[in-house]
Amino acid sequence: MTASTNTLTITRPDDWHLHVRDGEAMRSVVPHTAAQFARAIIMPNLKPPVTTAEQALEYKQRILSAVPEGMAFEPLMTLYLTDNLPPEEIVRAKAAGVVACKLYPAGATTNSDHGVTDLRKIYPTLEAMQREGLLLLVHGEVTSSDIDLFDREAAFIDQHLIPLRRDFPELKIVFEHITTREAAQYVTEADRFVGATITPQHLLFNRNAIFTGGIRPHYYCLPVLKRETHRLALVEAATSGLPKFFLGTDSAPHAAHLKEHATGCAGCYSAHAAIEMYAEAFDNAGALDKLEAFASFNGPDFYSLPRNTGKITLVRESWTPPDSFAFGEAQLKPLRSGEALPWKLV
């Protein structure tokens, strides 16, 4: 890393948690990620979900076809865990270059209805993943109606993550988009088989952002933004230098009219300015010197993949993201639209 007061050059980063959808909508958003990141872990929660190696490879080709000419970008593919995903598919996935499987508790978030209803049902598949070296990516929230929305992550640790670690001690697990002090502490104290991603919105904002001046649906994501004490714990984890924590935007594009709705869907779109927002968060914490490891080194090291060799440069220059982007035939409202951002990718 090279840095001055107003310029920051780091190894080209990767995004270890990304949604790009499919079809024409996908073609609208892939260029934003490809402009910033060399690789990205692609979430499999399409309709229908990506549950076979063959489907993953077909999806990968569709994503690659949306990468603008002259840009180098590698989608890293995942499978969607269901109650019925057979262990044999894990072997085929490994051979096809799939790197991970995603665990969505049924009903936890967007397009998760096919998710796992009982972890015991997938133990043979998890055993195959541990044996083959595929990572387990978890949306760490319980879905029981008797658990408060803001407590679902902490409950997931006690009810599911601790038993998973006990029963599969050498299965690498990524606790995705952590949002709480409890999650940060759990990952910090866990062994080398546990890592975590953190989004830009959870580093920059607390739950007040959803309600300032009225309901602000474009700040609504799952897991939802939490109290300021939790945000500060996430900043401390991200800037700690610990290799367990790494960049994962969870950038989740939705048509604006489906966000600005009586039952608006969850997800923040950050791919247009992701690395700039991470730089802002690290700068606010006085920890720009820790950004490169978080954004560019910790993720590939955890996945046992080579680090990138290219560089990107950010400058301290105010700019304002547009109010909207095309999203297929609809419009997409990005996170921080119309707001001045202090760092800019050049």
From Swiss-Prot:
Function, as annotated: Catalyzes the reversible cyclization of carbamoyl aspartate to dihydroorotate.
Name listed for the protein in its UniProt record: Dihydroorotase
This protein's GO CC annotations: cytoplasm
Pathway assignment: Pyrimidine metabolism; UMP biosynthesis via de novo pathway; (S)-dihydroorotate from bicarbonate: step 3/3
Subunit architecture: Homodimer.
Required cofactor names: Zn(2+)
Taxonomy, superkingdom: Bacteria
Keywords for this protein: Hydrolase, Metal-binding, Pyrimidine biosynthesis, Zinc
Cross-referenced Gene3D superfamilies: Metal-dependent hydrolases (3.20.20.140)
GO biological process: 'de novo' pyrimidine nucleobase biosynthetic process; 'de novo' UMP biosynthetic process
Family to which this protein belongs: Belongs to the metallo-dependent hydrolases superfamily. DHOase family. Class II DHOase subfamily.
EC code: 3.5.2.3
Active-site residues, as the UniProt record annotates them: D250
InterPro entries: Amidohydro-rel (IPR006680), DHOdimr (IPR004721), Dihydroorotase_CS (IPR002195), Metal_Hydrolase (IPR032466)
Record-listed N6-carboxylysine modification sites: K102
Annotated binding of Zn(2+) 1, by residue: H17, H19, K102, D250
Record's catalysed reaction(s): (S)-dihydroorotate + H2O = N-carbamoyl-L-aspartate + H(+)
Gene giving rise to this polypeptide: pyrC
PROSITE patterns: DIHYDROOROTASE_1, DIHYDROOROTASE_2
One Pfam family hit: Amidohydro_1
Binding site for substrate: H19, V20, R21, N45, H139, L222, H254, A266
Protein's organism: Delftia acidovorans (strain DSM 14801 / SPH-1)
